[in-house]
A protein has these predicted regions:
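N-terminal secretory signal peptides
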Residues: 1-10
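Short cysteine-rich clusters marking metal-coordination/redox-active sites
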Residues: 131, 150
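N-terminal pre-ligand scaffold of iron-sulfur
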Residues: 1, 38-130, 136-141, 181-207
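Short linker/helix segments within small regulatory modules
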Residues: 142-145, 169-170
């Protein structure tokens, strides 16, 4: 079943972050994600193109299990990746670009405009895990304040306000991934990211 698969992948209720103290998210086996520049050159054109497309299912990382809204309780946060086509092998550089944080709060806690609110689903919101300052992994979540924190330079983002920067050197919010449900009730991307993923200091074309 879906819940059995989710539990096996580490997305079961006991494994989700439910305490108010920040905790590291999904970093086991992903140490290179902490500073993406250590992976080697990441040209702007390659970095800005992620694997997310309209209709791509969100899957657990680790585990590659598709996710339904019922798998996430209020206060939960999980790292997810785009589902791979059959036979395709996930590359480390793709994980660096594609990693997303999935967070569930009470819908009434959002302070979003109509468009951004339409990108959420029943209190579930998704952001790129890659800090928009220097490309580190945003790895801490404080449940009471609904803040995400990058441990490298302490950039802090408000989940309720579309990951608006409220502290630290980052110049822009974390890109938000629009969510929807497919015909089987699994969470999918409504569309690709509408803004570049990754550090602001790299110049990119807006297209």
């Amino acid at each position: 079943t879906v819940k059995e698969g989710a539990a096996a992948a580490g997305l079961g209720r006991r494994s989700l972050i439910k305490r108010s103290l920040g905790a590291a998210l999904g970093l086991v086996g992903l140490t290179p994600l902490l500073l993406l520049r250590d992976l080697g050159p990441l040209p702007k054109d390659d970095f800005s193109k992620t694997s997310w497309e309209a209709g791509t299912r969100l899957v657990t990382d680790p585990g590659d299990r598709p996710i339904k809204p019922s798998d996430l309780e209020i206060g939960a946060v999980a790292q997810v990746l785009p589902e791979l086509p059959n036979g395709k092998v996930r590359k480390l550089e793709d994980i660096g670009k594609d990693a997303v944080l999935l967070i569930r709060i009470r819908p009434e806690e959002f302070q979003l405009d109509a468009e951004r609110l339409s990108w959420t689903h029943e209190g579930i919101i998704a952001f790129s895990k890659i800090c928009s300052h220097m490309g580190c992994a945003v790895a801490l979540y404080e449940q009471q304040t609904k803040h995400l924190l990058c441990p490298c330079h302490q950039s802090t983002f408000d989940v309720t306000r579309a990951a608006k920067v409220i502290f630290g050197p980052s110049a822009r919010p974390l890109p938000q991934l629009a969510l929807a449900l497919d015909s089987d009730g699994y969470l999918v991307a409504k569309q690709p990211f509408t803004e570049p993923v990754g550090p602001s200091f790299w110049e990119r074309d807006s297209a």
